[in-house]
Amino acid sequence: MALPPFFAQSRQGPPPPQPPPSAPFGCPPPPLPSPAFPPPLPQRPGPFPGASAPFLQPPLALQPRAPAEASRGGGGGGAFFPVPPPPLPPPPPQCRPFPGPDAVERPRPPPPGPGPPWSPRWAEAPPPPDVLGDAALQRLRDRQWLEAVFGNPRRPGGLRTPRTPAGPSLGEVRARLRSALRLVRRLRSLGQSLREAEADGAAWASLHAQAAPLRAELAERLQPLRQAAYVGEARRRLERVRRRVRVRERARDRRLSGRRGAQRTEREQEIDRWRVKCVQEVEEKKRDEELKAAADGVLAEVRKKQSDTKRMVDILRALEKLRKLRKEAAARKGVCPPASADETFEHHLQRLRKLIKKRSELYEAEERALRVMLEGEQEEERRRELEKKQRKEKEKLLLQKREIESKLFGDPDEFPLAHLLQPFRQYYLQAEHSLPALIQIRHDWDQYLVPSDHPKGNSVPQGWVLPPLPSNDIWATAIQLH
């Protein structure tokens, strides 16, 4: 393939114009070089079919130079490798569709003529490098390439296909119907006036003159509405708008239902928590009553003994008071008991009081021991209840953890040992089975510890960081929720 004119070492001008070859399948012949149709730029064959990708021209130092120019270039004296120029983009397509029987002949381009002196794209060859120099020649080549790549493509000079007019808008149809309705109302009132003014010819003629333009305007307004295409396009647009409104309403209903469902779930959770709290309070009160009843049953015997002791003390006090009254009555009669009788009575009273006091202390010690025993049993019962509650909470947490792990790593029951992801599961769960691995993981985490008042510091999450819920319905359809 011959080099373009601006790559040739010495060329006087463009080649003479050749007759255009026959164009197959109705494609017009390529235009001749002229001011209206610049010549196509040459292409270098590449390894792929079709036009090669546009590349910029190589630097001037890498382009081949003539021997004379190389000998004239001073300084350096290095050898230049014969690097071929990069491919240039193809010209804009000049073909049109296959003409039909009613197609007109495509106008021929004007004959070639001298182009404007400021346009370097025409068929005239640029001056040799000796006249322009390396920098000017490089600028000329860059300008030609930029004009070929980024220039406005020239449209073929044939008949343009008329653009299909856009369909009627709903606002236009609505305005047309409203204006037609107003005209109908006006014409109806004029018709009533015409029927009333049949006897008066002048008034009837005046009213008829007013109704004629309104009738013509109404016919003009209703003319598009009689066309099936116009009405069909309006109906399609109206159906499209209705469909869009239905889609928006369904999306809004889904959002509202989801919000209501979330609120309903939250209220149900609050009600469940309140019910659990009430049940726990009732159970605690019932348990306290049962423990109190059991304690009363155990301490009943001791309390009976204590009550007997108090009754004996009261009896002794009453006996002492009775003897004092009898002694006073005998003294009034002149009978005085001997002093030994008083000493014997006081001796028996002191002995009985000591015995009752000793029994009371013994009963109190027994009551304290029983109370301590009952408190220990009650504490043991509370501890068992707390352990049972903690066991339930732990089972619940383990079940939740198992569910989270099944979501992240799959169900362990359905996870065979020879599964492809088993090494990954062992790697991420190695801290649960190996103490050195746990220490190493905690050591790796502790390397990122910062003071509590650090602005960018935060606590290490206690569990798995689960992804958030889908943000919209379209994303939710791509996720299988369990």
Swiss-Prot record:
Coiled coil: 233-408
InterPro entries named among the record's database cross-references: Apoptosis_promoter, PDCD7
Listed GO CC annotations: spliceosomal complex; U12-type spliceosomal complex; U2AF complex
Subcellular location: Nucleus
Keywords: Apoptosis, Coiled coil, Nucleus
Quaternary assembly: Interacts with RBM40. Component of the U11/U12 snRNPs that are part of the U12-type spliceosome.
Protein name per UniProt: Programmed cell death protein 7
